[in-house]
């Protein structure tokens, strides 16, 4: 099985988890100039951009620790481009950035893991 297929499986698991938590699915694997958005969800009127990370173990800090500052900046840029394509921005839309970290068989949802400020 390819890495891409494995990643897609974890993203689907994350999507279902978030849907059960009450979020609404909008899009997955949105490739934009400068980055990719794993999942785009809605929580009421809030756009939720979700980074899904998987690590087999927490030997090197686990999945959540792998979302570095540089990765955050790429996600912020990709989300800004995505919003601009809809005539919106961080100033005109309610947005948040969540991380759904899967380490081994443990799933951890981190709402508001970082922000655009």
Swiss-Prot record:
UniProt-recorded Gene Ontology molecular function terms:
nucleic acid binding
Family note = Belongs to the UPF0102 family.
Q: What is the lineage of its organism?
A: Bacteria, Pseudomonadati, Pseudomonadota, Gammaproteobacteria, Enterobacterales
InterPro entries according to UniProt: Restrct_endonuc-II-like, tRNA_endonuc-like_dom_sf, UPF0102_YraN-like
Organism of origin is Serratia proteamaculans (strain 568)
Q: Could you name the domain of life of the organism this protein comes from?
A: Bacteria
Q: What's the protein called, per UniProt?
A: UPF0102 protein Spro_4337
